[in-house]
Amino acid sequence: MELKNLHGRKARMLLVYPDYTDRDCARKMSGGNYSEGLASISAVLKQGGHHVELLHLLNLHTEEDFKKRLREKGEFDIIGFSIRTTAFPDCQNYIKWTKEVYPDVFIICGSYHCTLVPDEVLAVDGVDCVCVGDGEYPELELCDKMTAGEDYTDTKSLYFKNDD
């Protein structure tokens, strides 16, 4: 795995939140659910000087719709997927489509499914890293080390494709 080096520039991260449990639902009627985990990650990264945005998915997206929303958000160094077990099949598609739009983006996955079965998530094509457990400080360390051009593969709670 080639390490991502931001050459002193703070990281730009997009957090993707598939906020639906029923794959057949047309659309959530409300504004969706609040994710304390993603809010905490966003706050810690922003306090560290990094740029963070959210792509809040309130319903299952087609390839065309997902890619359109992704492009509308702009370009990022890192895209993080919050993966519950019920959303894992959809996230596999979202990750594939993300890599088709931004082939060089670094993809990190976290949340419940990643903590329960990290090897299954890490085996998905396009996934660079999986966070097991709370992600605020491991992801801050990841972003800081990318900014500094340092090796980040020893960051606690993060597992990479080349790990045994």
Place the predicted regions along the sequence by residue:
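Nucleotide donor/acceptor-binding cores
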Residues: R9-A11, D77
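A structure-centric signal for secondary-structure junctions around beta-strands
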Residues: K10, S35, D154-T155
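Short polar catalytic/cofactor-binding loops
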Residues: Y17-D22
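Glycine- and acidic-residue-enriched helix-capping/strand-helix junction motifs
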Residues: R23-L38
